[in-house]
């Protein structure tokens, strides 16, 4: 299902020439993204291009600054901000990534290209629920919840770069009653070939 219009509130599009030289960045945010039929108009001369997009990159992330005509696509990186403790215990803004390589603009007609986005953030929720308070009780604060992963530094192609071991811990712990509790934490993307 297309979650763009309901979950994405900011888009940054990076445009590169066919050789990967940075040309410019174009951004949009706000209610226009939530219409369900959003299109970003990009004015380009005839030629071949590469497009890369990060969506939802707000205060939780740092993206490298690029210089037009100088920087290359390999210079574009995103890093999750972190304290010296390497503990991430706040809710992250949902982050999305997409790219299109080898786009050929002929200039003969209006041309539409679709950038499919994949989500780079995960929310993990633990729900503890007993049948009643008399037969089963749990104190959600009596446990430690943590995901350790070095997945907070992303390359232009969304691959993971070498990173610190980050400690993802709960940003929300709620004891509903003696038999129910909720714990939420988040992390950046998981990969099947990596152990967390």
Question: Residues of each region from the PLM?
Answer:
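Tryptophan-paired
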Residues: 9-66, 136-196
């Amino acid at each position: 299902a297309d979650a763009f219009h309901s979950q994405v509130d900011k888009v940054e599009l990076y445009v590169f020439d066919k050789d990967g030289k940075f040309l410019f960045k174009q951004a949009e945010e706000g209610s226009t993204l939530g219409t369900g039929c959003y299109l970003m108009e990009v004015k380009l001369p005839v030629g071949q291009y590469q497009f890369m997009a990060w969506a939802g990159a707000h205060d939780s992330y740092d993206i490298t600054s690029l210089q037009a005509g100088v920087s290359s696509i390999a210079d574009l990186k995103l890093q999750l901000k972190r304290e010296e403790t390497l503990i991430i215990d706040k809710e992250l803004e949902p982050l999305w990534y997409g790219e299109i390589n080898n786009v050929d603009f002929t200039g003969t007609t209006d041309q539409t290209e679709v950038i499919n986005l994949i989500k780079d953030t995960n929310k993990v929720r633990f729900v503890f629920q007993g049948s009643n308070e008399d037969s089963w009780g749990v104190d959600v604060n009596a446990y430690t919840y943590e995901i350790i992963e070095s997945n907070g530094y992303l390359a232009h192609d969304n691959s993971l770069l070498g990173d610190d071991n980050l400690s993802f811990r709960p940003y929300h712990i709620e004891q509903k009653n003696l038999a129910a509790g909720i714990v939420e934490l988040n992390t950046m993307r998981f990969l099947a070939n990596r152990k967390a």
